[in-house]
Design a protein with these regions (language model features):
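Short, active-site-adjacent cap segments at secondary-structure transitions
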Residues: 62-66, 114-115, 436-437
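N-terminal glycine-rich phosphate-binding loop for ADP-containing cofactors
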Residues: 2-3, 8-12, 22, 75-80, ...
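Active-site-proximal alpha-helical scaffold in enzymes
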Residues: 117-120, 124-126
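Glycine-rich phosphate-binding loops of nucleotide-dependent enzymes
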Residues: 70
Length: 719
């Protein structure tokens, strides 16, 4: 009856019709403009068909439909209200046409039915789900809301409170949870999904009054009073505030919309949803979070693009090695073994090897306790790690990560030794360093083209970012191989060029220096932490310094003060971190830093104020005084932003997207802000330059570059 590139309409035996989603241009089905156009054309054919007893919706892909095509969101976000509402109303009209067909409809859900994929299923009279499938409306995690009837149909199906909870959280729901909620009507085994769905459709066709009576409930108001709905919405919003503050407004918009729509008919509620959907797309959070989603895809794509020229000749890593055990080495070994890569963990000290194995075992035990691994699987993973004191144990490894102590002389010696022990001249060697020049380390090697930096962030198992540091001699093939290796480890590789601090530490320490300058002017570091955590950082800069370790902080400053002396300048009379370090305060590692630490009931460090630190700072910097919140934000994020602009202009990082993703992956930069570059774009580059000029007399870190001023004058953005 109809055959498109993304879907087909077919007449089946027994006078049933089937719309089958099968995107020929991609690995998954999604509601991009082409699919929606083809669905519109198929609906014309469907309405003209005669002697039809029912409609079945299916998918030939491993998923049903994963939702709208986010790559098309920028066009949608730039539409006027009238244009946007007209587009949303058009799709909603098409979905409602399915719901209003004069015969029963059934959706057979496999894999994932997310966003618009679930919304079209909600139009059907019945939903049959594969036991391995999940459903969900994840739009709030993108800073938006369901826009094709999800806020209207789900509460009329499962009840207001449950629907609100699902939509606000954005979390996927398993087949069992969906069944218990009443969102689906039958769970089928994957191999019998279509057959079982057809049986349900045939039964409905034989009993017309049943499906017609169920439709009546879906077309009217929700079974709840406005007062009850308002109370439920308030509870849901308070729960969001307790977790995320006011930073994710989409959840609040959804709650307000669903309360307003609960007494309306379907069509009136959908009309209300169209306008609310437009409003939420105009927020900075929507732009940031959808940009984040696209940024994640871009980072992975860039890694694959780098590897493409070598795909025909390159082989995946068969055996890896980490040189240097302990906590970091054990974490790297664990990540390799977990992803199926055999790894040699080499050290010269048995105690360090024991600690590395213990770290890997601890992480595996945690996975077993959380139900993510079976005991047998954990044992199999651990068996992939080969601890060794023998240098010859790494001979046949094709990828080596050096992770010894952060001393240049030691690393250079170890790297030269490793290179001499490898049997293949094509083996790749990397250094897990956070501060040491890759170019200088390469001087110790005979084949520097096979060498680059591979900076893992701690803890390795939890932090997604790996900085791949390109040295002057690093070959494209080496960079491609290490990016591919990082992807196999489940990490997000971002390539940066060698410079002091590389990318993340360079811009992070600009922000930390911004904090230390404030403290030297009499600011209260506790107020700074409170303001920056309210702004969205996972922890304030003083607290973060304690977590990193003040010995590490002092070392990193020394690298940047030496490497970038024109902007990273000593603070008079002293940096607060140096004062604390000189007083043998190392942060969490010895319980004394900006804060004092003790173990809580869960055995984790808990911080409290330390009057001795406050007294020390008052004696050195004067009595603490309060600063305006906006000045604190501007002084800290402004320093980070201007340093990131310089990194972009110098080619340290290739694009604003990669720059922002590095901060989100590496330091937990608030996702709802989209990254430092997007934050500056939202601020406006003219205002960013004005902010920099305001504080440039305090430090050259704040001074805007000439290229940034030109962009600002032209009304351009970093993106």
């Amino acid at each position: 009856m109809y055959q498109g590139e993304t879907l087909s309409l077919t007449r089946l035996d027994g006078d049933f019709l089937e719309i089958n989603f099968n995107n020929q241009n991609g690995s998954v089905n999604k509601f991009d403009s082409q699919t929606l156009n083809e669905l519109r054309e198929a609906m014309v054919m469907l309405k003209q068909a005669e002697s039809v007893k029912g409609l079945l919706l299916t998918s030939s892909k491993s998923v049903f439909v994963v939702g709208a095509d986010i790559t098309e969101f920028s066009v949608m976000f730039n539409a006027t209200r009238d244009e946007f509402v007209a587009q949303a109303a058009d799709v909603n009209r098409m979905f409602s046409d399915i719901e209003d067909l004069p015969y029963p409809t059934v959706a057979a859900i496999n894999g994932f039915a997310l966003g618009g994929g679930l919304e079209i299923c909600l139009t059907c009279d019945k939903r049959v789900i594969s036991s391995s499938a999940s459903i969900g409306l994840p739009e709030t995690s993108l800073g938006i809301m369901p826009g094709w009837g999800g806020t209207v149909r789900l509460p009329r199906l499962v009840g207001f409170n449950l629907a609100l909870g699902w939509i606000v959280s954005g979390a996927p729901q398993s087949a069992d949870k969906a069944m218990a909620a009443g969102a689906v009507d039958l769970i089928a085994e994957p191999n019998s999904l279509r057959k079982d769905a057809l049986t349900v459709l045939a039964d409905l066709a034989a009993d017309s009054p049943e499906f017609l009576s169920q439709r009546t409930a879906k077309l009217g108001p929700v079974s709840i009073t406005v007062q009850e709905a308002s109370a439920a919405a308030e509870d849901a919003c308070n729960a969001v505030r307790s977790r995320q503050g006011e930073n994710y407004p989409a959840a609040f918009s959804v709650a307000e919309l669903m309360v307003s729509a609960c007494e309306l008919t379907r069509d009136d509620a959908i009309s209300l949803e169209n306008h609310a959907f437009f409003d939420v797309t105009q927020t900075p959070q929507a732009r940031a979070l959808t940009g984040l989603f696209l940024g994640e895809q871009y980072v992975v794509k860039q890694a694959k693009v780098r590897n493409a020229p070598f795909a025909a000749t390159s082989q995946p890593v068969a055996c890896s090695a980490v040189i240097g055990a302990g906590i970091m080495g054990g974490g790297i070994a664990y990540q390799n073994a977990l992803k199926g890569i055999p790894i040699v963990m080499k050290d010269i000290n048995q105690a360090a090897l024991d600690l590395g194995v213990s770290e890997a075992s601890k992480l595996l035990d945690r996975g077993v306790k959380r139900g993510k691994l079976t005991e047998a699987k954990a044992e199999a993973v651990l068996s992939q790690i080969s601890p060794s004191l023998d240098g010859d144990s790494i001979t046949n490894c094709d990828m080596v990560v050096e992770a010894v102590v952060e001393l240049e002389s030691v690393k250079a010696q170890v790297l030269a030794s490793v290179e001499s022990q490898l049997s293949s001249i094509n083996s790749v060697i990397t250094s897990n360093t956070s501060t040491i020049s890759i170019n200088r380390l390469a001087d110790s090697l005979q084949r520097p083209e096979n060498f680059c930096g591979m900076h893992f962030f701690n803890p390795v198992h939890a932090m997604p970012l790996v900085e791949i540091i390109r040295g002057e001699h690093s070959s494209d093939q080496t960079i491609a191989a290490v990016c591919a290796y990082a992807l196999r480890l489940g990490k997000k590789p971002i390539v940066v060029n060698d410079c002091p601090g590389f990318l993340v530490n360079r811009v992070l320490f600009a922000a930390l220096l911004g904090m230390e300058m404030l403290i030297a002017e009499g600011a209260d570091f506790e107020q700074i932490d409170q303001v920056m955590e309210k702004w969205g950082l996972p922890m304030g800069p003083a607290y973060l310094s304690d977590v990193i370790g003040l010995d590490t902080i002092v070392h990193c400053y020394s690298v940047l003060l030496k490497g970038l002396p024109e902007r990273f300048i000593e603070i008079e009379p002293s940096r607060s971190s140096q004062v604390l370090f000189d007083g043998e305060r190392l942060g969490q590692k010895n319980g004394l830093g900006y804060y004092r630490y003790s173990k809580n009931e869960q055995g984790r460090p808990s911080k409290t104020a330390d009057t001795s630190v406050i007294e020390t700072f008052e004696n050195l910097f004067g009595k603490a005084k309060a600063f305006e919140e906006q000045e604190i934000v501007s002084r800290i994020m402004g320093a980070m932003g201007m340093e990131m602009v310089r990194c972009l202009e110098e080619g340290v990082v290739a694009s604003p997207t990669e720059a922002d993703m590095a901060l989100i992956y590496g330091i937990g930069f608030p996702s709802f802000r989209g990254g430092i570059c997007r934050w500056m774009d939202e601020l406006g580059l003219s205002d960013a330059c004005a902010m920099g000029d305001k504080y440039s007399s305090i430090s050259p870190l704040y001074a805007p570059t000439e290229a940034l001023r030109v962009k600002a004058a032209k009304g351009e953005t970093l993106y």
